[in-house]
Amino acid sequence: MKVGIIGAMEEEVTLLRDRIENRQTLARAGCEIYTGQLNGIDVALLKSGIGKVAAAMGTTLLLEHCQPDLVINTGSAGGLDSSLKVGDIVVSNEVRYHDADVTAFGYEPGQMAGCPAAFVADEDLIALAENCIQQLKLNAVRGLICSGDAFINGAEPLARIRAAFPTVAAVEMEAAAIGHVCYLFNTPFVVVRAISDVADQASHLSFEEFLVVAAKQSTLMIKAMLTTLAQRG
């Protein structure tokens, strides 16, 4: 088994990359892919860069060059579910774009033409993540994660997203693009991110302060998931 792991930023991948054994690096078009073994599993760790285009391009490179059996998207997110606090975990049941709008042609908010309304995470990977959450005794929410090319900060964009997607649990900038590419490649995926900020008017300050906390928590989750997969054989 080979596991693809995707993080957008240096802070989101460095703790994992530094632990990869027999590490090799592929650099292409602004992306970096690190291959080797981590916690007993063959891995391909992608640092994609920020935003939907970077995430889609990087995920495509990852799937084409490394052919992982599954993909886990790690990193940070802004919490919209009222029960989420900094350091808590959000697990995707599905991902959607919050900044796509072709509703004039009968599509749902966030739905791209010719695509499903949402990209649905793999149930087995969701169960794996939730099992690890219980083992680690972390607070977590399973729900909708919405992505767009904007850092959500302030009442107006928050209200717009909540109005269009009432069940949204968290927002960030890559997960829907990753889910979109995995859907096209028929590769199972799940998003497991830690909360770095509660999306509000001061979220940019919280993000800068707590990104490292979120990175440590999401790394803890990835390592636990890999260990469980290795034990299953």
UniProtKB/Swiss-Prot annotation:
Its EC number is 3.2.2.9. One of its GO terms (cellular component) is cytosol. Substrate binds at residues 78, 152, 173-174. Pathway: Amino-acid biosynthesis; L-methionine biosynthesis via salvage pathway; S-methyl-5-thio-alpha-D-ribose 1-phosphate from S-methyl-5'-thioadenosine (hydrolase route): step 1/2. SUPFAM superfamilies: Purine and uridine phosphorylases. Belongs to the PNP/UDP phosphorylase family. MtnN subfamily. This is 5'-methylthioadenosine/S-adenosylhomocysteine nucleosidase. It comes from Yersinia pestis.
